[in-house]
Amino acid sequence: METGFKEMNLTEKQLDSTEIFNGKLLRVFKDRVLLPNGEESTREYIKHIGAVAVVAMDNEGRIAVEHQFRYPFAEELMEIPAGKLDSEDEDPLEAAKRELREETGITASEFEYMGPFYPTCAYSNEVIHLYFAWNLSFGERSLDEDESINVEMIDLNKMVQLIFDGKIPDGKTQAAVLQVVARLRAQ
């Protein structure tokens, strides 16, 4: 069946770039670009060093979930353990192991990379590398000075229901948890 959709060139070319802000967490840029139709436009976007997020599941089918206050939303959110890379060349797997251990005290002997997640692709280049971890051991946490996090283990099926009920607004948590469910069902 013919749809009438026509394929077009989508690539935009950067003409120049100006850094507007350089902070601890992110950098903001304003670029002038050439559009595929020949017109010029402006793109404002955030550059982020990147991050990791981990679904850590124990032998009872429970996953580690964090409760933390998120200032931009002025509310406590439930999320999987996550954190930013320490440098642009840091191995994401090593960052995932570090963040899981620091925030929850959990170490895992098995990790599977589930792929990249782009949380805000319209205005940021942030990439969150998603991991599934199992064969867990529990120890002491070592939170950063600016972190206040409560941790609990929640049944994976209950977490899925919380997502479907709209109780987990965090995108990386939704994507990673549902991907784990799909992977487990495919086995």
Predicted regions and their residues:
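Extreme N-terminal tail/first-helix region
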Residues: M1-N22
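Conserved Nudix-box catalytic region and its N-terminal flanking loop in Nudix hydrolases
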Residues: N9, R43, A53-R98, R141
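Acidic, metal-coordinating catalytic segment for phosphate/diphosphate chemistry
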Residues: D16-A53, N59
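Unchanged
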Residues: S41, G50-A53, K84-G171
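Generic C-terminal helix-cap and adjacent flexible tail
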Residues: A182-Q187
